[in-house]
Amino acid sequence: SAYASEGKYNDMDMLEIGRGLSEAEERTHFGMWCIQSSPLLIGCDMTAIPAKSLALLKNKELIAINQDPLALQAYVVKVQQNGVYLYVKDIQILNGTTRAVAIYNPTDNEQSFALNMNDVDLDGKVKVRDVFAHEDMAEVTKGVMHVNIPRHDTRIFILKGEKRKLRSIYEAETAWLERYQCLGINNSLGYAKYGDAKFCSGGGKVEWLGNHKDNYMEWRNIYSKEDG
C-alpha cells in the first residue's frame, strides 16, 4: 500500500467479471480491485455479460471507493484465525472519521468475523453503509460489529465514526522499501522483500534489510495530532 498515490496505482490486471466466476467470487474480485484503487479494465464480452455481473460493474458506491481522491490502497490490519482478512483505508479525508473496510473470506466455508472498531481506529457511535446492498445498517454503539461472510465472498462497508483514534500499529508490510525486489538473492544484492508471517498482526513481514546504504524501510504516512 505504500506505493499507491495519486497517479501511481498498483495494476491488478484486467477484471474477469462476467466470465464464469460465482456471484460471491465476482463480489470479491471487483470489490478488492476497488478498495485497492486498481485501474478497472473490463475483460469480458460486453455483449454477453450476465445482468448481475453488469450491475456489479456499475455499482457507483464501489466505483466511488476506487476513484476516491485520496488514491489510497487498502492495507491488511488483521488476519483472523479462521482465515478471514480485514482491509481498511481512509476515504474522503486523510486521517478523518470515514473509512472503507473489506472483510474477505478466501476459505471454502462460511465464516464469522467480529469487526472491532479499535482495529480500524474509530471511536464512538459508528454509522455503517453496506456498499454491495446499497443500504445503511444498524449503527455500531458498543464497538463491535458481527458479520457473516459466505465462502469466497467479501463484505465491504463505509464506516463513519464520531472520533478518529490514532493508529497504534504500523505493520512492516505497509512500509516503503527503498530497495525492493522479489527476484534474486536479496541478501547478497542488498534488496529487501516482503514475506508471509502467520505470527505477525497482518500476516506479513519484511526480510533482508541492510547490506546496502539505501536498503531501508520507512513509513511515510505516520500521523499524530501533537508533536512528540
Indicate where each model-derived feature is located.
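Glycan-recognition surfaces
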Residues: 1-45
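A general structural signal for short secondary-structure junctions and capping/turn motifs
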Residues: 6, 21-26, 32-34, 54-55, ...
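Active-site-adjacent structural elements in folded domains
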Residues: 18-20, 81-88, 140-142
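Catalytic cores of secreted or luminal carbohydrate-active enzymes
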Residues: 28-78, 152-174, 178
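Carbohydrate-binding surface patches
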Residues: 33-36, 41-43, 80-122, 152, ...
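Surface beta-strand/loop "capping" patches
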Residues: 76-98, 167-170, 176, 210-218
